[in-house]
Amino acid sequence: MKKRPHKWKNDQAIYQQLMDELIAGILDHTYPEGEMLPSVRGLAERYDVNPLTAAKAYRELQRAGLVEALRGEGLIVRNGVRAGLMKRERARFLKEEWPELRARLARLEVDARMLFSGSAD
């Protein structure tokens, strides 16, 4: 498994940031519903974190009902969780991130044409 270079933020525990990465992976189908997640060791190596940190991220995802353990096999993403995550993440984005982004776009006079073309001309 290829390492993913990652810059961890100082204002949040690494296991929480790792959980966010895994949730993003569920949302973008890197970790599809019903599929196995990497082993704790594999996840730790991939993100260059301590295996205890990877295990804690998995425990918290399990506690949140997003993944389940299959005895002797590992963890899988539970079926049906992506839709709920998508709803939650959209609501969070619209409440927490969009207002600031929209204000910045207005200050810079960026319109939809510019956004979709990727050009300021």
Short names for language-model regions:
Residues 30-31, 35, 63-72, 78-79:
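Beta-hairpin "wing" of winged helix-turn-helix
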Residues 1-36, 42, 86, 92-121:
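Extreme N-terminal segment that seeds HTH/winged-HTH DNA-binding domains in transcriptional regulators
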Residues 82-84:
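A short, flexible beta-alpha/helix-coil linker loop
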Residues 75-76, 119:
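Conserved beta-strand edge residues that scaffold enzyme active sites
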Residues 45, 60-63, 75, 94, ...:
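General helical structural elements
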Residues 36-68:
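N-terminal helix-turn-helix
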